[in-house]
Amino acid sequence: MPVKNPRKLFLNIPVKDLKRSMTFFEGLGFSFNPQFTDETAGCMVLSDDGYVMLLTERKFREFSKKEICDTRTHNEGLVAISVESRAEVDGLVKKAVTTGGKHATDPQDHGFMYGWSFLDPDGHHWEVFWMDPAHVQKT
């Protein structure tokens, strides 16, 4: 069912080195919206309505009073993004690991859904998954 007024999602995550993070994600095929990108933030485009704001730790602290999570020892969350095929899952994760990311989990095949995950250079956990459209109920 189409949403009348789709909401835009901006996921904000802190990064230690903005240039390194942007280069990493550009290497995975993502682009950045220059309107919301500067020396303190990179607006990575996931879709027409989904974005990931890579914020320098200093900029991130302007939005939250809580301590920034040490991703070497703690999970702050799990970012899951869908792709069009199992092959795209494998390709994206392999590229992530060869361009500065780290292996997070082994591939998981549930038949109707397949996923694999990596850690970006700042330790954020990314799950890349494919789901068989025939198994997704329309609401």
Predicted features and spans:
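Core segments of cupin and vicinal oxygen chelate
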Residues: N12-F60
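Residues in well-ordered beta-strands of folded domains
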Residues: M53-L55, A80, F129
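N-terminal beta-strand motif that seeds the catalytic metal site of vicinal oxygen chelate
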Residues: M1-M22, L78-I81, D132-T139
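Vicinal oxygen chelate
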Residues: P2, R7-K16, M44-V45, E67-T139
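Charge-dense, helix-prone N-terminal extensions
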Residues: G27, S31, F36, T71, ...
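A short, acidic/glycine-rich surface segment
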Residues: F60-E67, V136-K138
